[in-house]
């Protein structure tokens, strides 16, 4: 899943589509992208989502930077969330850069987070989704800090 502007260029459209990627409109709750995510998960596929909505370089992942889509999809599909912290990406591809630079990056994988149970109606509790999003934010912050340290990047 990636921002829809990545599909406007034929080369990047081909690249991301060939990897199984699909666009998401970040300006609203993109129901089509959320449903595509649920379908892929139901088929046993992995779906990569960035709950911050864009690249952030720290030092703090603020609560208002987080979007609820990951917690919603995980809970709707009753699929655990596997949080991942990435360190060093700002050196490999600084914001606005056109090319990736050789640079040390570190990926740290955390323990899975359990989705919230569905209501009897089969719906997802909005307050439960928000609580799971906050749990995810806390987990990601710790993983990001660890990944930055391992990549030798000051987290400031």
Question: Which residues does each PLM region occupy?
Answer:
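Non-catalytic C-terminal accessory region of glycerolipid acyltransferases
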Residues: 32-156
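Catalytic core of membrane glycerolipid acyltransferases/transacylases, capturing the structured
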Residues: 1-29, 36
């Amino acid at each position: 899943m990636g921002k829809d502007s990545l599909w406007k260029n034929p080369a990047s459209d081909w690249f991301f589509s060939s990897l199984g990627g699909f666009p998401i409109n970040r300006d609203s709750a993109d129901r089509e992208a959320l449903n595509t995510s649920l379908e892929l998960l139901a088929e046993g596929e992995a779906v990569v989502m960035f709950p911050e909505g864009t690249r952030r370089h720290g030092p703090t992942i603020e609560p208002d930077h987080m979007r609820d889509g990951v917690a919603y999809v995980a809970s709707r599909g009753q699929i655990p969330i596997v949080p991942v912290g990435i360190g060093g990406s700002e050196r490999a591809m600084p914001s606005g850069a056109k090319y990736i630079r050789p640079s040390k990056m570190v990926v740290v994988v955390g323990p899975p987070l359990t989705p919230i149970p569905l209501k009897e109606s089969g719906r997802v509790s909005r307050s439960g989704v928000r609580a799971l999003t906050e749990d995810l934010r806390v987990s990601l912050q710790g993983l990001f800090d660890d990944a930055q340290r391992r990549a030798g990047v000051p987290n400031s």
